[in-house]
Amino acid sequence: MSAAEYPWERALGAVPGGDGTVEFRVWAPHPGRVDVRVRGADHELRPEGHGIRSARVEAAAGDDYLFVLDGRELPDPASRWQPDGLRGPSRVVDPRSFAWTDGGWHGGAELQDAVIYELHVGTFTEEGTFEAAIDHLPGLAALGITHLELMPVAEFPGAHGWGYDGVYISAAQSSYGGPHGLQQLVDAAHAAGLGVILDVVYNHLGASGISAMEAFGPYFTEKYEIFWGKAINFDDADSDPVREWVLQSAEGWVRDFHIDGLRLDAIHAIFDMSAKHILRELNDRVHTRNHRALVIAESGLNDPKVTRPRSAGGWGCDAEWADDFHHALRVLLTGDKTGYYEEFGRVEQLAKVFRRPYVHDGDYSTFRRRRFGAPPTDRHVDQFVVFDQNHDQVGNRAFGDRLPAEVQPLAAFCTLLSPYVPMLFMGEEYGETAPFQFFTDHIDEKIAVATAEGRRREFSAFASFSAEDVPDPQDAETFLRSKLTREGDEAIRALYVRLLDVRRELPAGHDADAVDCDPAAPWLRVRRGPFTLAGNFAETPASVPVEGAGELVLATHDGTHLANGRVDLPARAGALVR
């Protein structure tokens, strides 16, 4: 398969040639004629076959351009920069012009040693930009963080949003600082010893971009239905150029922005019946570009094929999020059994996910009313990312409230001392009290109204509050309330420092037989080499047997005592002994 035979395999978008020209290439089988409008002139793109059209014209990095489809002006589907947002022109970018200083960087910590920190650029600082985040990197590195995980930065509607309604999947969000700002942040992160993982959304596009994309070609398929809109066309007629558009996006983040890993959003909504699944192909492309680059999946499948090697028939992701760990822990701590939480809440389930990362590994799910999942017996603990808070589990609550302060110490204890790869959500390390609410800045009135109404409708069935009280996503105050205040609890901050310090002393891996619990108490006990984790999930004190332990290494609460082979724990408290 050569580029001459399949023209979509060549670089899409605007590629500066270094000789005062730029090659513009786009997949556009739908229109009769396509021009590129740049420097005040139109230039017709010549057909290359399979709907690919191209032209090399006099232009340079920094020039704005638009494609003109039978007279209709539209941005480039492969745009690298939308300086005026979704409706403005694209801008030619030469990513090679950035003066990188990370020549000695080799990818950062291995997964088994990783501690990930999820952040939203727009609310992480008052300024809400890539550049403003740089000042906080040394502090995160000193805490023990090894990788930042940026929520999506592909160009989305307006000036603020979560990023999951992005349209231009290769363009760094203009309101955050555009491509140059992202390169600055990554370069500074590497200087601070931090890797950077980028959250990317390849299961759908934001509704604001559907009409534009459909003008070019069949980027979407009607074969499948997804919650957020139209499914991307990975296996229907004319899907090859669409696949390549996504693959070039993934590769471009790693190559041109020195991104150390991709977090793939909701892969259970990526539908592909091709002989070679798009996720296998994406892993091939990314790992060929950088063999140390990470691909981490958010999967609602509980299927070990996600991380199984491609050589063994899997999709080859390096790791996946382990939602069941969060659900088992949160419900046990809070008693919140709404929605899909309804089947969680027993300490035996938390013990199970300490042994293996899925609560449902082929057994019956009462929420789904069917058997669900498969045993991950051939997978390793460093292939699963765990958390007690993240953007979804906080922000998809009606008011975006974080874990209650009274249970956060025990939640952090379980998460950070687990055998898995821990991830923190921005601000939890010092007990941030600002909520993280669902906010948008849609530029299309119909979409804005539908989003706000949908949010109210989603929570109308809950008797604990009125749907009218649910924050309006389009109200700027909803966004502003979600910015970090950086005010918290010094005791929580000290606990996180100690937990992350102690984590480095724990042996790698785990023994599934070294986990037990008392459902009646309820308490959990996990042995990790010479160490034993003991957690009391009751609202009253408990005494947990820890035979042979002679040292209290760490306790989440005062009033914890170790004596005579037992550790006495206050309510909702944890201790590490050896």
Annotated model-derived regions:
Residues V26, F67, L119, L140, ...:
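Conserved, mostly hydrophobic/aromatic
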Residues H106-L111, H120-G261, A266-N290, L294, ...:
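Substrate-binding/active-site clefts of carbohydrate-active enzymes
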Residues W8-R10, V353-G373, L424-F425, Y430-F439, ...:
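Glycan-recognition and catalytic regions of carbohydrate-active enzymes
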Residues A549, H557, P570-G574:
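Tight coil/turn sites that cap or link beta-strands
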Residues M1-E23, D42-E118, T123-G128, G139, ...:
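The feature marks proteins involved in alpha-glucan
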Residues W27-R33, A60, A538-E539, E547-A549:
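Short proline/glycine-enriched turn/loop motifs at strand-loop junctions of beta-rich domains
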Residues L86, L279-A463:
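Conserved alpha/beta catalytic core and glycan-binding cleft of carbohydrate-active enzymes
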Residues A28, A61-D64, A563-R578:
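C-terminal beta-strand-rich structural cap/linker in extracellular carbohydrate-active enzymes
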